[in-house]
Amino acid sequence: REQVDRSVAERLAAHIFAAGHTAVLFSELSEICGDRLVVLGGDGTMLRAAKRASVLNIPVVGVNYGRLGFLTEFEREETDKVIPLVLDENCAVLRRAMLEVELNGSKFDCLNELALLHPVAPDKDNRVVTISVAIDGSHAGEFIADGLIVATPTGSTAYSLSAGGSIMTPDCETFQLTPVCAFSMRSRSIAYSNRSELSFSLPKGALVLYGDGVFLGQAGAEDRLTVRRSV
């Protein structure tokens, strides 16, 4: 698949060169630069590229060459449609809100979600955990569940949706708290302003933290964990 993607990228680059512009092919995220970024891949590739591009303030458009293409604008058979889009200097750019996760002073950005999950080990009992949440310092609720998801509007169609969360349109000025396999059927998702800051009271023993599916670390009662909108 890498060879197919490379040949497609070379063909797109040739069209861009023919239009009088410069095109550079990248295979590593650390190499990314330029005014527009075209990503050939699935949602995993889009997530990694978008987070890197956001640091550089580069707009991203994706073509689905992977398994899932929720985040990509075009499917494989629509590849050529990306050319006039990236050449149009007046094309609309949709900005997506991201999470900034801070764990004991270390910061991580998430485009989809932060997941706090109870670790499952073959030699230990599997029990639910209790997580208390404060919004801007005020107690907002206590969740008894296998874990908790903090989702952006972009991530509302991913893990959060599978856990029973609501779908939010990309322009919503909200984030969403969704319990994972909640102990009580009355425990539901909470939508809150993305201008607010979340803080957590975590149980004894470590929870596992994942940002967009990537392991971030572990956190427990002695750790300080906050989530806010990334600037």
Map each language-model feature to its residues.
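ATP/NTP phosphate-donor binding region
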Residues: 1-36, 40, 48, 52, ...
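A residue-level signal for conserved active-site and pocket-lining positions in enzyme catalytic cores
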Residues: 38, 64, 114, 213
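Short glycine-rich anion-binding loops that position phosphate/pyrophosphate groups of nucleotides
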Residues: 42-45, 68, 154-156
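Proline-centered loop/turn at the N-terminus of a beta-strand
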Residues: 57-61
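Catalytic core of DAGKc-family lipid kinases
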Residues: 68-146
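A generic structural signal for short beta-strands and their flanking turns/coil linkers
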Residues: 95-99, 110-112, 127-131, 146-148, ...
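ATP/nucleoside-binding phosphotransfer catalytic cores, i.e., glycine-rich phosphate-binding loops
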Residues: 108, 116, 122, 135-139, ...
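Gly/Ser/Thr-rich active-site loops/lids in small-molecule metabolic enzymes
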Residues: 143-186
